[in-house]
């Protein structure tokens, strides 16, 4: 028998540049959730996702899933002692995070904190008293022990509303922020922990447009409240959010961030993990599914496979290429997108926007148009940056060159905005363009771009960039013959730009590019491109709406 030999270049050079990386360390003291969504398993995932080193001290072996807690089996006190003692003896520890605590674990931790004195690590206490599924995880004795023996050592306490009630020993009506402020102040007094984060996920609020949630951070030493307002995600899949948030805060503290920064970063991480979600439960589990802890984690093998220096193709052969274009009737992806049920409502509201009509007839207030030009100028900076990133991810030199040409065109468009602002609106300060303040609509758009840039591939970046190009042209094409703004006015000139023949040529190239990206995009993931296109059309609509509503 003849044997073949395959040589593989591993490890690649970029993995040998950082030797003995100094990772921040976080120790989680908590119970298990073998289904992986909460407890110590969620802690380890979260700590790792924040590029920190996770250590554990298991307080209870639980039989638990998102459905319910089936059983709780406490770890013997001597085992908890040995685990905590050995970890803190042999391992560095920047932050301790606690979750589900037993009476034995509290006694051991209390003694250790007293022993360490001023040398103890920072402490984040998530008073796990009630599971998201509604299961009680602690009796009155545990509540008292946490209050008396753990909370006074904590740098921050992170209860949700039901846990606040347990710690306070009473339920209260919560009708507004002042009620939450009072709860936080009372908790700080009872627990002797000066920093309290009251998590508001259990009580979404309503304003005129949408539901939202508020998390309130009380900084006792500064007598200050910081209110974090977040979008309410319409999902029941929130299993493990409390564990995850506390671990994210602990990880951020371990990385050297301040407490407010750490809380902000933790909240955003959890909101993203909830919004993105993950499909890991069986169909019988309708509620309280887990969140996506690893949404921002790279897959090492994918990074290796995309490396042109990778030589293990004999071991891992590339899959036969299937084209998503095969799923598009007529092969025109642009037409497919704008007529797709998920895209069409946002596309129609975008290209038929009242903003364009008011510019075309010259009735838009000057200050609103100036605001739009300023915001669009700042947007184009992001737009050019994403095209540069798209160029770096493009599969071939020709596609890279196209992205660079587009960036040059964007700079020309920015120059037109500079001219309008100087000649029409009297801008004279040379630093004016670097000082433009971004409005909420632009910030939302920019954050979306940042996310797609980090997580998306070349095709997904193209899908996110194309609605801007195509929508402006389509909107102004629909206004052909209807532009009544005086010739020579900034309004008329703006309309002429996007209705011009050269802009139509750019749109034709954009349409070709959309068809081109399908050639190498997996057909089973086509809905991802559809979703991106729909979401960006909605962002474009909101961008014009913001200009209309500017005061």
UniProtKB/Swiss-Prot annotation:
Functional description taken from the UniProt entry: Trifunctional protein with both thiamine biosynthetic and degradative activity. Within the thiamine biosynthesis pathway, catalyzes the phosphorylation of hydroxymethylpyrimidine (HMP) to hydroxymethylpyrimidine phosphate (HMP-P), as well as of HMP-P to HMP-PP. Also has thiaminase II activity and degrades thiamine using water as the nucleophile, resulting only in the formation of HMP (4-amino-2-methyl-5-hydroxymethylpyrimidine) and Thz (4-methyl-5-thiazole ethanol).
Pathway per the UniProt entry: Cofactor biosynthesis; thiamine diphosphate biosynthesis; 4-amino-2-methyl-5-diphosphomethylpyrimidine from 5-amino-1-(5-phospho-D-ribosyl)imidazole: step 2/3; Cofactor biosynthesis; thiamine diphosphate biosynthesis; 4-amino-2-methyl-5-diphosphomethylpyrimidine from 5-amino-1-(5-phospho-D-ribosyl)imidazole: step 3/3
Induction comment from the UniProt entry of this chain: By absence of thiamine.
Gene Ontology CC, one term: cytosol
Annotated residues for binding of 4-amino-5-hydroxymethyl-2-methylpyrimidine: 64
Coiled coil: none
Name of the gene encoding the protein in the UniProt record: THI20
Record carries keyword Zinc: no
EC number(s) from the headed UniProt entry: 2.7.1.49, 2.7.4.7, 3.5.99.2
UniProt catalytic activity: 4-amino-5-hydroxymethyl-2-methylpyrimidine + ATP = 4-amino-2-methyl-5-(phosphooxymethyl)pyrimidine + ADP + H(+); 4-amino-2-methyl-5-(phosphooxymethyl)pyrimidine + ATP = 4-amino-2-methyl-5-(diphosphooxymethyl)pyrimidine + ADP; thiamine + H2O = 5-(2-hydroxyethyl)-4-methylthiazole + 4-amino-5-hydroxymethyl-2-methylpyrimidine + H(+)
Family: In the N-terminal section; belongs to the ThiD family. In the C-terminal section; belongs to the thiaminase-2 family.
Name of this protein: Hydroxymethylpyrimidine/phosphomethylpyrimidine kinase THI20
InterPro entries: Haem_Oase-like_multi-hlx, HMP/HMP-P_kinase_dom, PM/HMP-P_kinase-1, Ribokinase-like, Thiaminase-2/PQQC, Thiaminase_II
Additional observations: Present with 195 molecules/cell in log phase SD medium.
GO molecular function annotations of the record: ATP binding; hydroxymethylpyrimidine kinase activity; phosphomethylpyrimidine kinase activity; thiaminase activity
């Amino acid at each position: 028998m003849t044997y073949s030999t395959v040589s593989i270049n591993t490890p690649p050079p970029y993995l040998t540049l950082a030797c003995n990386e100094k990772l921040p360390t976080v120790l989680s003291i908590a119970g298990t959730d073998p289904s992986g969504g909460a407890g110590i398993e969620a802690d380890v995932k979260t700590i790792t996702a924040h590029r920190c080193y996770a250590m554990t001290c298991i307080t209870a072996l639980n039989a638990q899933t998102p459905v319910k807690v089936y059983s709780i089996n406490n770890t013997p006190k001597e085992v908890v002692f040995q685990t905590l003692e050995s970890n803190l003896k042999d391992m560095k520890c920047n932050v301790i995070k606690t979750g589900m605590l037993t009476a034995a674990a509290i006694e051991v931790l209390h003694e250790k904190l007293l022993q360490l004195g001023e040398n103890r690590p920072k402490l984040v206490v998530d008073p796990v008293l009630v599971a998201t599924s509604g299961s009680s995880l602690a009796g009155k004795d545990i509540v008292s022990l946490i209050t008396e023996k753990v909370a006074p050592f904590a740098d921050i306490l992170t209860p949700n509303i039901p846990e606040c009630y347990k710690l306070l020993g009473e339920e209260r009506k919560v009708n507004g922020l002042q009620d939450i402020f009072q709860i936080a102040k009372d908790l700080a007094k009872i627990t002797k922990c000066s920093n309290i984060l009251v998590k508001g996920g259990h009580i979404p609020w309503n304003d005129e447009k949408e539901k939202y949630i508020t998390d309130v951070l009380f900084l006792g030493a500064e007598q200050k409240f910081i209110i974090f307002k977040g979008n309410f995600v319409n999902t029941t899949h929130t299993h493990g959010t409390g564990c995850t948030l506390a671990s994210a805060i602990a990880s951020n503290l371990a990385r050297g961030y301040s407490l407010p920064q750490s809380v902000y970063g933790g909240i955003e991480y959890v909101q993203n993990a909830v919004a993105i979600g993950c499909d890991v439960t069986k169909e019988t589990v309708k509620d309280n599914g887990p969140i996506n802890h690893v949404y921002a984690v790279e897959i090492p093998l994918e990074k290796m496979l995309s490396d042109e220096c990778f030589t293990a193709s004999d071991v891992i052969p590339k899959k036969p290429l299937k084209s998503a274009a095969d799923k598009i009737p007529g092969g025109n992806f642009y037409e497919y997108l704008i007529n797709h049920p998920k895209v069409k409502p946002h596309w129609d509201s975008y290209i038929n926007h009242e903003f364009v009509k008011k510019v075309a007839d010259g009735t838009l207030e000057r200050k609103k148009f100036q605001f739009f030009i300023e915001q669009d100028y700042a947007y184009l900076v992001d737009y050019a940056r994403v095209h540069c990133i798209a160029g770096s991810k493009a599969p071939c030199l020709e596609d890279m060159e196209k992205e660079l040409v587009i960036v040059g065109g964007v700079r020309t468009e920015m120059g037109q905005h500079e001219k309008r602002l100087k000649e029409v609106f009297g801008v004279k300060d040379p630093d004016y363009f670097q000082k433009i303040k971004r409005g909420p609509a632009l910030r939302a758009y920019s954050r979306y771009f940042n996310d797609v840039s980090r997580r998306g591939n070349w095709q997904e970046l193209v899908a996110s960039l194309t609605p801007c190009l195509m929508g402006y042209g389509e909107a102004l094409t629909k206004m052909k013959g209807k532009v009544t703004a005086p010739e020579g006015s900034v309004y008329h000139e703006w309309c002429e730009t996007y209705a011009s023949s050269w802009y139509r040529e750019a749109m034709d190239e954009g349409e070709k590019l959309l068809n081109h990206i399908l050639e190498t995009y997996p057909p089973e993931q086509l809905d991802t491109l559809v979703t991106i296109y729909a979401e960006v059309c909605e962002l474009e609509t909101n961008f014009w709406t913001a200009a209309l509503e500017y005061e």
